[in-house]
UniProtKB/Swiss-Prot annotation:
Name listed for the protein in its UniProt record: Translation initiation factor 6
Keyword Protein biosynthesis (UniProt): yes
Keywords: Initiation factor, Protein biosynthesis
A GO biological-process term: cytosolic ribosome assembly
Top-level taxon of origin: Archaea
UniProt xrefs under SMART domains: eIF6
Function according to Swiss-Prot or TrEMBL: Binds to the 50S ribosomal subunit and prevents its association with the 30S ribosomal subunit to form the 70S initiation complex.
Entry-linked SUPFAM superfamilies: Pentein
Length: 222
């Protein structure tokens, strides 16, 4: 299967969808071909909804096996759909684009360095993870700058050696591979162009063969 995908010609698939280990959340208007390819490549159930009445689900939603973290501006009908599949933590207006400011797996969550200590504690308690406030390549929106699973983290190519070393020390887990790369012909906003879990991945359709190779290497798909 071709490991690339677009949504109506837009390669920034991570802006519009959020993938978990057994579930993917996509916009209501996503074409059947888009939904079907995600279901097959990542071996997930696909649910359709909006968040805040918007299709930019990847920016507004994240989480791990313990539940969803989502913008506090989510509508009641949208929240009810998510709650059918897991518990939900709603972020307040201070920094509510959860998928933009949180990068998480089942062990740790890297968060925007300006996130308040109260919000960090709330996220840590809900997801049962260690909190790591950081930025990469000088960018604090870690949820869209990076991508991660329980076994790997892909950082933008312009991440500094100091940033990489700090993340390695903070995670302190030899079973989690850390590497750098890009998507969509050099974009450092990796999360905007990559949907990934332990079973597979899909990258934006502008992603080059070299970039696909880096993804497969870091996440162990080779």
């Amino acid at each position: 299967m071709d490991p690339t995908l677009s949504l109506n010609g837009d390669p920034n698939i991570g802006v519009y969808a959020r993938v978990f280990e057994d579930l993917a959340v996509v916009p209501v208007e996503a074409p059947k071909e888009f939904r079907d390819k995600i279901a097959e490549a990542l071996d997930v159930e696909v649910i359709e909804t909006f968040v805040q009445g918007s299709s930019v689900i990847g920016l507004l939603l994240t989480g791990n096996s313990r539940g969803f973290v989502v913008s506090g501006l989510i509508q009641d009908s949208e929240l009810e759909i998510l709650q059918e599949y897991g518990d939900c933590l709603l972020l307040g207006e201070e920094m509510n684009a959860a998928g933009n400011v949180i990068l998480t797996n089942d062990s740790f969550a890297v968060v925007h360095p300006d996130m308040s200590s109260a919000m960090r504690e709330m996220v840590a308690d809900f997801l049962k993870v260690k909190i790591i406030p950081m930025s990469f390549a000088g960018v604090g929106t870690v949820g869209m700058t990076c991508a991660c699973t329980n076994t790997g983290v892909l950082l933008p190519a312009r991440s500094t050696p100091e940033e990489i070393e700090k993340l390695e020390r903070s995670i302190d887990d030899a079973n989690v591979a850390i590497g750098t790369g890009s998507v969509n012909m050099g974009s450092g906003l990796i999360g905007t162009g990559l949907l990934i879990n332990s079973k597979g991945y899909l990258a934006g359709n502008a992603t080059t063969g070299y970039e696909l190779g880096r993804i497969e290497d870091v996440f162990g798909f080779l």
